[in-house]
């Protein structure tokens, strides 16, 4: 056996993984769209809750944002976004560090995806419910963000599979005594 363009690599798997380095970059970049979708959902649910009013016992209009069941999930999503923004920035900086090995870069992307996928799906579902039937309307973009999040979770494989694949890399990379 011989190679037409160069010598055959000693480790075919390592050669293959080094040739597809862009996948590691994408594994960090893609989940960032989930944060953008959550921000869009929070904005829409917040505006809807400020605009929609009901009449109280005193027959005065009251915005539904004043109810705990309405503002609670919106504030919870805002708190999550605050944490996710910081987590994403930290992950990006760590990913870009020149001394970080490829398996660790892959792990950073897989962890970011796993954390953001599960929480953004739950968050967007809750925000959609806070908007009633209007949460399902295409022009409000909440359901659209849920579908985009679902598509991104499928894009590089299920988070369980990514986590399982990541395990042997860490076991061989770090030796525990």
Please place each PLM-identified region on the residue numbering.
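Flavin-dependent oxidoreductase catalytic core characteristic
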Residues: 1-177
